[in-house]
Amino acid sequence: MKTFTAKPADIEKKWILIDAEGIVLGRLASIVATRLRGKHKATFTPHMDMGDNVIVINADKIQLTGNKRNKPNYWHTGYPGGIKSRTTGQILEGKFPERVVTQAVKRMLPGGPLSRQQMTNLRVYAGAEHPHEAQSPEVLDLASKNPKNTRS
């Protein structure tokens, strides 16, 4: 039996809508990363962008377990003495709360050029509105998949 390798013409990308309200961040990010890579498909090929286009709404209403909301996130500006930090709670209450979800998904993907290409298929919105109604995305309900996915 020959090994199957997908061709670019064989790849079918769907649009998936995920409502992040009440969903635990790490569980959301791991499912989104799997969908972006295309590992949920039987025709998965590791060196090709096979994943779906994923839309995440209500990113500002995600849940964090334990004391992670008060844990600082560090980054460096690139300038001398440019180490900065903010807690995850401060970022969620700030101007761009969707960055928490984006960074969690980005860090669950491998670090190569293909992962950067796959990250362009992720769209994260803080509110419930999104401009992708024309693509008629399929709704993926994470809350009903596993009771551990939600937090009250």
Swiss-Prot record:
Keywords of the record, alphabetical order, are: Ribonucleoprotein, Ribosomal protein
Q: How is this protein organized at the quaternary level?
A: Part of the 50S ribosomal subunit.
**Similarity annotation:** Belongs to the universal ribosomal protein uL13 family.
So what does this one do?
This protein is one of the early assembly proteins of the 50S ribosomal subunit, although it is not seen to bind rRNA by itself. It is important during the early stages of 50S assembly.
Which protein is depicted?
A: Large ribosomal subunit protein uL13
Quote the cellular component terms of the Gene Ontology held in the record. Answer: cytosolic large ribosomal subunit
Q: Which SUPFAM superfamilies match?
A: Ribosomal protein L13
